Regions:
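N-terminal [4Fe-4S]-dependent radical SAM core
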Residues: 97-101, 121-122, 131-173
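Conserved, surface-exposed functional patches that form binding/active-site neighborhoods
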Residues: 82-102
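Canonical Radical SAM [4Fe-4S] cluster-binding loop centered on the CxxxCxxC motif
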Residues: 168-190
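Beta-sandwich/jelly-roll carbohydrate-recognition scaffolds of carbohydrate-active enzymes
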Residues: 6-9
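Short, well-ordered secondary-structure micro-motifs within conserved domains or adaptor modules
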Residues: 1-2, 18-20, 24-79, 83-87
């Protein structure tokens, strides 16, 4: 698969997003581009108020594009805002091209419950219902299906309750990590 990135965003993050729609794809710098070859072209632009990402995705000779704009709100880090803009653009282009909307939205990595917990804590600090606000953000900003957003907030709530009871010599157990797009040879999750 050919991947083109223009803008200040990590290549690995963009690859993990591409793997949502192209599972098992390899990314080669030397691969020649042809009209039939799978490709994603991503452009990220920024100004003082926002980040705007545009994704053009090609598969089987067909092509779709989408863009997403995320405001710099002074609350989230610029890195998180950039990632949301890029994720939303790639997700929408892929959803249109393939006709599917993956239930986990743009959540990648092995600890999405950590994000849900951070969102809930932030909402509670502002006087909101933490779980409800976290679910709203997960479905709205991160494009997760409502049932997956609810599951994440439940996992986050349970993690938070357990963390207080586990001593410093405790450990975490992960069961079926659906978020990580790769299975590295050294990974203990496999």
């Amino acid at each position: 698969m050919k991947l083109y990135i223009e803008g200040d965003i990590g290549r690995y993050y963009v690859q993990t997003l591409c793997l949502i729609f192209f599972p098992g794809a390899g990314f080669s710098e030397r691969e020649e581009e042809t009209a039939e070859r799978d490709a994603v072209r991503l452009t990220l632009r920024e100004n003082a108020q926002s980040y705007t990402a545009e994704a053009i995705m090609r598969h089987g000779g067909e092509q779709r594009s989408a863009s997403a704009r995320e405001l710099r709100d002074g609350i989230d880090s610029d890195e998180r805002i950039k990632k949301r803009a890029v994720g939303r653009a790639i997700f929408e282009a892929g959803a249109e091209l393939f006709g599917i909307r993956p239930e986990w939205g743009i959540l990648t990595g092995v600890r999405p419950a950590k994000l849900a917990e951070q969102l809930a804590e932030s909402a509670r600090a502002k006087g909101f219902d933490g779980a409800r606000e976290a679910e709203r953000i997960l479905t709205g900003d991160y494009l997760a299906a409502p049932e997956k957003a609810h599951l994440l907030t439940e996992v986050a709530r349970n993690n938070s309750a357990l963390r207080g009871r586990i001593g410093s010599d405790g450990c975490s157990v992960y069961i079926s990590i659906p978020f990580c797009p790769t299975r590295c040879a050294y990974c203990s999750f496999v």
